[in-house]
Amino acid sequence: MLYLVATGDYKGPSENHLSFTKGQRIEFLERTENGFIKGKLDGKVGIFPSSLITIETRPLSIIQNQPIKYSTETKDDTGSISSSTSTSTSSLTTPRAESSKDASGEQQPSTSTINGQSSSTSPILQSNGTTNTTTSSTSNNNIGDNISEKSFGDYDDTTSNHSKSASRLSVASFSTTTTATTTTTTTTTATSSKDKDKKDKKEKKEKKDKKSKDDDKSEKEGLYRKSKGSSSSSSSSSSSTKRRYANRKACEPWVVKKYEDIPEEVKSDMLKEDIPIKDIQDHFKLFLRILKFITRQKITLLIPIDPTIPTKEMNLLDLSDAESVAKSTTMFTREEIRTSAFDNVDAFVDAPIMDDNEKAAKTTEIKLERKRILTGISTEFLGQASTTIRVIPSSDIKKRIKFTHMVGRGQYGKVYDALYDKKRVCVKVVNYSTPKEQHNVLQEIGFLTQCDHPNILKYNCSVLYGSDLFIVSEFIQGGTLEQASASSHVFKETQVGFIGLELLKAISYLHEKKLIHRDIKAANVMVSTDGEVKLIDFGLCASVEKGGSQHMVGSPYYMSPEMIRGEECSYPSDIWSFGICILELLFKKPPHRDSRMKAMFYNAINGIDFPKIRCSIDLKDMLWQCFESNPEKRSTVDKLMRHPFFKRCESKSQMKSVFTDMFSTSSKNSISTTGFF
């Protein structure tokens, strides 16, 4: 008998639905259609959404529509059918689907460790609480380096990543498994060998990480990432060079009351930012907020309780001295600098949790719940998105998906020009193993499935293969608006008008559905040789009605002032980002391109400097409506679409020739490093 645990409250809308509260145990009976599960609770039989149940931290919100397989007999060595001597019963398994087979169709054994005991990479959770073993294989995450120019057949399906398998939160399916005693013995022997290899690899990794931390110690001390082996003097590149900021999340938290309290190495780097210190002092809290967003540095700001306290007396406090810190508690209130309403996750983690693994799992769970709140989605939303994921046998997948060349590479995956069922498509390959990875992918898929508009990328389906997910979408022959802006072509205002109007149509569609994109930028807009303009990348999309409005997300150059300042954000934020895209088309780069910090800082306090914009009066007026600092006075998308500027834009047929000339000569291996969607 298999039991499931409810991860949330659910009230059935009809009599054939079960109702339960978080933490209740539900007896599993069978899986039904549309992501629902049939179970038994307190003697009542009914259905409920799979997104609200879990078993040993493996949520079933991503259950696939795979048939339930029952097997009560096994073949012995002589080939005859005999009853199994294993104690295995009906169980829940985390599949690697058919992808666990190699090219010959045979499964290869692979092991990992769960709760200190050896097991297969696909642990079977039995009804009696014990762990059995099956044989499986983990696919190589570096799929981009193993895909042939002509076909999928050269994909290297190895077991090199078996150590990651224990923590994987992957698409689950139901099956019953029986294992012969001889198989269990063989697997146990293999497990011992694998555990030894795993231990050796872990020790090597720890040594490598320690060395890396020692080598990069100076990197964490400053504001910027330093190239390996470079000195501090060599790191002072020119202002025209795009700088890479250091990730200071693991650095010592700051407690500051003024700019002078910031560490010297950071203040030294700030001299390269071309931001006057006086401006930073006048907008110190805003500066700290931007600094936290860019570097993830933990910061606490001390604010005077009594404004009449002399500034000189406050400045004499040495925050590195224990006595001064104790005195500061009577003079200041402490305010943690945040980029969202739920920044401090540690405050929500139960204090009694002592085990590091349990605490890490709890922290991850809280972070994902926080993200769902801020984007206005639910576990049901993710469960519905997971129903578009397909599990195809490896023998068929190599015939149905054929990769050609890579057309894009981003932070979360690679994009390939491919054939799916003999139809040309784009396939984005992403890791799909950890809870965070799965949550992010399902969130994007969920919003894409809600959209059906000619100016928004059309999502087809997703295919699970090992620990990777292939996100299949329509193929677009062309490139990004960022690539178009950086080309030698100089856009006329009439051409800018066509692109802008098409993009506004996509934004209008989202706003009508009570959604905001929150990451509109030139790299997230595709233009095709057919004269089409499509909005892509819905990873930061959110619901206006259900989501949190105070959350700092997006791309620094395109971020609206209200989002940078920590105010409530809604539809006007997308309008601001749209305006920056228009400026990039006109001037080939967004304002303050040389520094993300400078762009965010001055966009938040000064807005856009209109006198420097040389264009027609109606275009300048349209941009003025986009860049109104007060979001309540900023134009709406419908009002912008009726603006006179867009009445003189070029036609689709005219733009078709422009985009064809722009992208027809580009190499097939030319990629956009900013991502695809």
From Swiss-Prot:
The protein's name = Probable serine/threonine-protein kinase mkcF
Q: Which InterPro entries would you find in this protein's record?
A: Kinase-like_dom_sf, Prot_kinase_dom, Ser-Thr/Tyr_kinase_cat_dom, Ser/Thr_kinase_AS, Ser_Thr_kinase, SH3-like_dom_sf, SH3_domain
Report the GO terms under cellular component: cytoplasm
Q: Which residues bind ATP?
A: 407-415, 428
The SH3 domain, residue ranges: 1-58
Q: What is its EC number?
A: 2.7.11.1
What GO MF annotations does this protein's record show? Answer: ATP binding; metal ion binding; protein serine kinase activity; protein serine/threonine kinase activity
Q: Where is the composition biased (Low complexity)?
A: 79-94, 127-146, 175-192, 230-240
Per the record, the GO terms for biological process are: cellular component assembly
Q: Which UniProt keywords apply?
A: ATP-binding, Kinase, Magnesium, Metal-binding, Nucleotide-binding, Serine/threonine-protein kinase, SH3 domain, Transferase
Entry's transmembrane regions: none
Top-level taxonomic group: Eukaryota
Q: Where is this region: Disordered?
A: 72-244
Instruction: Note the Pfam families from the entry.
Output: Pkinase, SH3_2
Q: Which organism is it from?
A: Dictyostelium discoideum
